[in-house]
Amino acid sequence: MTKPIRNVAVLGATGSIGAAALDVLARHPRQFHVSLLAAGQRVDALLALCHTYRPDHAVIGDATLYTTLRDGLNAAGLATKAYAGEAALAELVASTTCDTVVAAIVGAAGLHSTLAAARAGKRLLLANKESLVLAGMLLMREASISGAEIIPIDSEHNAIFQCLRSRTTNGVHRVTLTASGGPFRGHNRTMLAKITPTQAMAHPTWSMGPKISVDSATLMNKGLEVIEAHHLFGLPSEQIDVLVHPQSLVHSLVEFIDGSTLAQLSLPDMRTTLAVGLAWPERIGSGVPGLDLMKHNRLDFEHPDTETFSCLRLARDAMQTGGTAPAVLNAANEIAVSAFLQGRIGFLTIPALIEHALTTLPRYEADTLETLLTVDTETRRITHAALTHFPLPL
């Protein structure tokens, strides 16, 4: 019996994860139809993707670019319907337009559409880690009510998901997330003070966008992933470990109470995890070759240096504090990373700004979306204001 084609929405289509998702989808035209493409501001790139994939709908986040998108689609003779803005995207994601959503919008901007997909009971391939960090309790609650199927796309959480064959953690003693260590593994603080945005974006093993590359360099990416694992798998902090693994071949390990440990290994390529999410529980080709252990015959592990790279420690502290503290962490980090990429602050000012926000703002219960968004806005305001009080980059 032929299975029905799955209609897939790719949110953040012009980014690195969006490109990887579309690559996998294009390999399986009889199984998947790209029904919706969404991007933030890169309207020309979105138009090019629409020409290639012929989606039913296209959404540009920046409403001022709506006319450009609409006219570009008409000029190309495409039947794709144009939309703009966060509300339009959330409405489309919740509609019958799609049954599968690749949530790859970077930052808190992806929260509304991710929540909309969860509320509508979609299969949600979650690559937007900020949604879990900012509103993890709300997101998981909505998914539980609607029956939405959340499959994490981060390589570490996807590895845990594969080892467990679900998000059920019966019999789990602990999980270990691996980190490449970023491009500055082994650097001291004196060396880090001179790091430039270009250097920070040169990740040794993964191909990623600017923001996540900087997060990897500061180890904030791993801190956010610890919080993600807490929400996705219902594990407390003491059952979530982190090890630096520079080869990026072992993506996570799951240790069970009987002494067994399962690990997932693959080449560092997001197409693998996206293929898992799209076809689960079946397997489909991703375009990624298998792992040749004779070629990659060395696996190294070490503890992370949380004194030099304090973002990982700050993330754990925020998770332990709970409530709105992770939302503060996330918003302050987004502002700090943006300022660093613009050359307005130095690399070491990123954790300093985050710590400033965490110590300045009070903790509230994270029980409503309105509370979280208010805290997010206030955190961005005080972090913006604090930029002038920190030294300029060397």
Swiss-Prot record:
Residues at which NADPH binds: 14-17, 40, 128, 130, 209
Enzyme class at the top of the EC tree: oxidoreductase
Binding locations of Mn(2+): 154, 156, 225
Single GO BP term: isopentenyl diphosphate biosynthetic process, methylerythritol 4-phosphate pathway involved in terpenoid biosynthetic process
Keywords linked to the UniProt accession: Isoprene biosynthesis, Manganese, Metal-binding, NADP, Oxidoreductase
GO MF, one annotated term: NADPH binding
Electron transport as UniProt keyword: no
Reaction it catalyzes: 2-C-methyl-D-erythritol 4-phosphate + NADP(+) = 1-deoxy-D-xylulose 5-phosphate + NADPH + H(+)
Family: Belongs to the DXR family.
Record protein name field: 1-deoxy-D-xylulose 5-phosphate reductoisomerase
Biological source species: Xylella fastidiosa (strain M12)
